[in-house]
Amino acid sequence: MSYVDEVYERVVNQNPGEAEFHQAVKEVLDSLKLVIDANEEKYRKMALLERLVEPERIISFRVPWVDDKGQVQVNKAYRVQFNSAIGPYKGGLRFHPTVNQSILKFLGFEQVFKNSLTGLPIGGGKGGSNFDPKGKSDREVMAFCQSFMTELSKYIGADTDAVSYTH
């Protein structure tokens, strides 16, 4: 079995149920296969692919916030800090009911490559929550976002993580 195939198999085994992440890793590894195979011993010794496919850190946290009826709601949130080899983690936030760790790992993994092409000293990451802004009042969205950032601020800093928001 080739080094690329071994690493992909390990990703699948160590990250069960994360189909989105598996697919992103497979596509990247497949595109690198010829280059990696030609220099397999060198890359294997450096554990290049293992370092490429494993996030540096995944932060999982809860976000309590109060809706317009005075009810406390709690959402699940994540920040995947994938790779800081060339600079602070950079990647947006996604708020959607389908957000889960697999989706954010997939997006953070791809963000590493996207950011590396800018020529700027920034790494890759992604964050988000299963919060659904659809049908929420402006006050509810603001309450959620303020709580999200309060909780996230415990784990990030100016030299560590550069968060951007897109919707």
Predicted segment positions?
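Generic start-of-chain signal for non-secretory N-termini
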Residues: 1-19
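Ordered core of a single globular domain
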Residues: 16-29
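Structured beta-strand/loop patches that form or line metal/cofactor-binding pockets in enzymes
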Residues: 41-69
